[in-house]
Design a protein with these regions (language model features):
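Conserved small/polar residues in nucleotide/adenosyl-binding loops
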Residues: 167-174
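A composition/biophysics-driven feature that prefers long, compositionally simple stretches
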Residues: 1-166
Length: 178
């Protein structure tokens, strides 16, 4: 935020909020996110979400981390309070028009990618090692499948289902099984 010269950072993409705060939810079927908005300044983090979306221990952890929870829809009134001398960093591609239109016209908007984009994409050493192991395991499984297929084609009946079953068996083997 400081490098960009911003006073406030508005984050609206649900996966980025979940990643940044390390929270999961069930507001959207089959997607572990919480319907929310986040506004960060140099001194505070405001999370706009339904309090019922969180268990007590999560609320306590957020509070301990300095995150203040506000009602989900109150974001629209809050952004109206942005001062004209403030610079607001947000990604217009990921912000709804109602939110942008509620920001005072004399507030300077810095339209840039979310600050979470690069850190989210950066793998730590454990993630890199686990990815390497997964690639090796998958490569061995595919090699075994191709060998099995070449060896057995024409010798035994092979259907799509039996081929998929074989690949699933190989894919679930651990490296020590291989």
């Amino acid at each position: 935020m400081e490098k960009k010269g911003a006073d406030l950072f508005v984050l609206t993409s649900l996966d980025d909020i979940a990643w940044l705060l390390n929270i999961r939810g069930g507001d959207i079927h089959c997607c572990p996110v919480v319907l929310s908005y986040l506004v960060m300044t140099k001194t505070e983090i405001r999370l706009f979400a339904n309090e019922k979306a969180f268990q007590t221990d999560v609320l306590e952890a957020l509070e301990k981390d300095g995150v203040t929870l506000f009602p989900y829809d109150s974001i629209y009134e809050y952004v109206k309070t942005f001062k004209k001398d403030k610079k607001v960093l947000l990604c217009k591609k990921k912000v709804n028009s109602r939110l942008v239109s509620n920001i005072p016209a004399d507030t300077r908007i810095l339209d840039e990618e979310n600050l979470t984009l690069l850190p989210k994409a950066t793998k730590n050493p454990v993630e890199v090692e686990n990815e390497r192991i997964a690639h090796i395991r998958d490569g061995v499984a595919v090699t075994k499948f191709i060998y099995w297929l070449k060896k057995n084609v024409g010798r035994i009946p092979i259907t799509e289902l039996s081929a998929v079953s074989y690949t699933h068996l190989r894919a679930h083997e651990t490296l020590s099984d291989l």
